[in-house]
């Protein structure tokens, strides 16, 4: 003990002091209680013990700074906090103030400890690179470059102002690995530090420490040291498990985004720059209030949103603020990117609700459509949902002023004479003076547009497998309800390829009188959209009834217009022969590819009689079909 005391020059005449009886107000710079020739100072604000050498330190005096040598024999000057007598008395008398003071000191401790760790990392970077680099970084250009006045050519440690934060000297800056060769880096297979694999090899690194190397071709991230910018993109200085610090490399975010060390890195820096990040976020949120929800962003960007990108940008901005950097170009670029990320983040909340609403509508729709093939709903264009006032139905709703059709009293007897109904038998179409509608082998329509379809009914001798029973079995093709990109709203496309003459679906809605349809049509024309379909197959007189699919309907509600359509509308009678109340059904006019949008001509301009369609000329509506023969005006 005596030897140790002699070595450090302890005054053996010092007596243990009773601090409770110590009158702080009477202490002076020359008081023996506060003076030591060889001082050991516990500098709590930088997180380590500094040993003063040949330095007289006065803990309570007019001295404002202390100069000492650190463990690397570098001169360090630390500014001491000078407490007033009033504050000292308050701390001694108030336990609450002492606790608040200690909390503040601990916060400073965490902040400066992080800065010290970065400073240590920078010193390691000044060591010469080893010749045995990992295989994936053999092409890295490690030539050092002199600091340039151009911010884009700076090494990563300077682009965010680390030089001013860590107090490094100018000659240290020149030795930091440059990012000039970053573009040549090959992507590593990064993985998280975990249990050693059976194939791990043991080797000595340059420090003489035994380290376990991962299998050949794999490199494990041991630690992410810092983040900087290269051409306005974040890059990370990575320490690899089993390799010396001199073999650290700069990696892009894509290379290390999925590593667990990235989560630790982000969490650590968010705590370090908590105050700066909070202030920056508040500033960006004020700018965000003035931006429309989806201005200059796409649904694809919303779906691909990653919170990590925003977190990294906020950390980069905080580093610039903390360093007092005068650079404007880089923070501006990062700020614009962070603002867009926050805009996308805001839209993502709306997107989640939208997808939930669309999924619910899809579920209800397919429940109504059973047992028909499912219909998929998707919107990759905007954040719109299906109108909540629209009710999906399976069969037509008969209005109060519309008479209910009476059941037919006539049915064919084809199976009594032959095995099945064919074009050569006296089937239902023959009774109405029309042609047999379908080909027997393919079940495809064999009629031209404008013809009528008469199917077998419940009074016919044939069963449900009859080739003249197609529409009554319902939709048999899968479809997709999607949002169009040309401003036409929702549309319908084929999920699979369709042949010419295939039945697609029936036009379903409310069957109302023509007088009521005229009243509703005025409101629809004002909105530039109509769902009124006149049941006027009998052209000898005006139509008596109209189908309105605006508020009640099925998938046909969403089929758009085209001047060159791939669908045609046919009138069809099944259980009754009331000419004024046919079913309106859609058949394909030509082969349709999978994914092709389905459309029909709302206004048959090639036919002056204009059968089945409701014409409205009150408002001119632009046609957006984009076909070569487009009439430019819909109605």
From Swiss-Prot:
SMART domains in the cross-refs: CHROMO, PreSET, SET
Domain Post-SET: 619-635
Residue positions binding S-adenosyl-L-methionine: 488-490, 531, 560-561
Binding site for Zn(2+) 3: 421, 456, 462, 466
Location of this chain's protein in the cell: Nucleus; Chromosome, Centromere; Chromosome
Segments for region (Binds to Su(var)205 and Suvar(3)7): 81-188
CDD domains xrefs: CD_CSD (cd00024), SET_SUV39H (cd10542)
Source organism superkingdom: Eukaryota
Single GO MF descriptor: zinc ion binding
Binding site residues for Zn(2+) 4: 563, 623, 625, 630
Summary of the function given for this chain in its UniProt record: Histone methyltransferase that specifically trimethylates 'Lys-9' of histone H3 using monomethylated H3 'Lys-9' as substrate. H3 'Lys-9' trimethylation represents a specific tag for epigenetic transcriptional repression by recruiting Su(var)205/HP1 to methylated histones. Mainly functions in heterochromatin regions, thereby playing a central role in the establishment of constitutive heterochromatin at pericentric regions. Involved in heterochromatic gene silencing including the modification of position-effect-variegation.
Complex and partners: Interacts with Su(var)205 and Su(var)3-7. Probably associates with HDAC1/Rpd3. Interacts with Rrp6; the interaction promotes association of Rrp6 with a subset of genomic loci.
Family the UniProt entry places it in: Belongs to the class V-like SAM-binding methyltransferase superfamily. Histone-lysine methyltransferase family. Suvar3-9 subfamily.
Name of the protein described by the UniProt record: Histone-lysine N-methyltransferase Su(var)3-9
Organism in which the protein naturally occurs: Drosophila melanogaster
Top-level taxonomy: Eukaryota, Metazoa, Ecdysozoa, Arthropoda, Hexapoda
Encoding gene, per UniProt annotation: Su(var)3-9
